[in-house]
Amino acid sequence: MTEETPGFEEKPDVPSGATPDDAEPQAASEEGAAPAGDASENAGLVAQLDQVRTALNERTADLQRLQAEYQNYRRRVERDRVAVKEVAVANLLSELLPVLDDVGRAREHGELVGGFKSVAESLETTVAKLGLQQFGKEGEPFDPTIHEALMHSYAPDVTETTCVAILQPGYRIGERTIRPARVAVAEPQPGAQTVKPAEDAAEAQDSSGAEDDAGTKESGGPDEG
């Protein structure tokens, strides 16, 4: 029976004729392959990172676009809501204008007394809170966008078409005119603008003649020959 000698291990099989120097190139090639593999892996990670960044930028742009569209939608809905409210209020107040006209006539004739006066004042306060404004005053220039001329006349003391009487007041809500003011207007007297310059020229000529006479008197008259 063969006994193993303590302290000795079996040696690996080594090809015949191999030397220790033959193992060094193999180890060097394995060490050189490792950095090349790391560089390839890093390049792949960089490419993936670029793809993720591109996708993130695209999604961010999509979210920003959706947010802008939503904000525009909210503003449009709010604008439409305000417009619908204004139209509804205007339609309601238009139905109350004849009542307000009756209240105004009663006030002019001194008939706005008692309980009728309280109801009328309450109505006027309510419509004012809803934004109803009355307009139209005597003496203001005629504006066809807010005035409706029912009567025409001529007056020598006006230089432009002027409202001389308010037959029915106008009403508006903000910039929206519910009813134009119905008025009587006076226009400048025909020929007044042409006569006045002639009168001014005559007055200027008379004044010039008077100055010439005064100068002649101061100089002692013409020289005696």
From Swiss-Prot:
<keyword id="KW-0963">Cytoplasm</keyword>
<dbReference type="InterPro" id="IPR013805">
    <property type="entry name" value="GrpE_coiled_coil"/>
</dbReference>
<dbReference type="InterPro" id="IPR009012">
    <property type="entry name" value="GrpE_head"/>
</dbReference>
<dbReference type="InterPro" id="IPR000740">
    <property type="entry name" value="GrpE"/>
</dbReference>
<dbReference type="GO" id="GO:0051087">
    <property type="term" value="F:protein-folding chaperone binding"/>
</dbReference>
<dbReference type="GO" id="GO:0000774">
    <property type="term" value="F:adenyl-nucleotide exchange factor activity"/>
</dbReference>
<dbReference type="GO" id="GO:0006457">
    <property type="term" value="P:protein folding"/>
</dbReference>
<feature type="region of interest" description="Disordered">
    <location>
        <begin position="183"/>
        <end position="225"/>
    </location>
</feature>
<dbReference type="GO" id="GO:0051082">
    <property type="term" value="F:unfolded protein binding"/>
</dbReference>
<feature type="region of interest" description="Disordered">
    <location>
        <begin position="1"/>
        <end position="44"/>
    </location>
</feature>
<keyword id="KW-0143">Chaperone</keyword>
<keyword id="KW-0346">Stress response</keyword>
<dbReference type="Pfam" id="PF01025">
    <property type="entry name" value="GrpE"/>
</dbReference>
<comment type="subunit">
    <text>Homodimer.</text>
</comment>
<dbReference type="GO" id="GO:0005737">
    <property type="term" value="C:cytoplasm"/>
</dbReference>
<dbReference type="GO" id="GO:0042803">
    <property type="term" value="F:protein homodimerization activity"/>
</dbReference>
<comment type="similarity">
    <text>Belongs to the GrpE family.</text>
</comment>
<comment type="function">
    <text>Participates actively in the response to hyperosmotic and heat shock by preventing the aggregation of stress-denatured proteins, in association with DnaK and GrpE. It is the nucleotide exchange factor for DnaK and may function as a thermosensor. Unfolded proteins bind initially to DnaJ; upon interaction with the DnaJ-bound protein, DnaK hydrolyzes its bound ATP, resulting in the formation of a stable complex. GrpE releases ADP from DnaK; ATP binding to DnaK triggers the release of the substrate protein, thus completing the reaction cycle.</text>
</comment>
<protein>
    <recommendedName>
        <fullName>Protein GrpE</fullName>
    </recommendedName>
</protein>
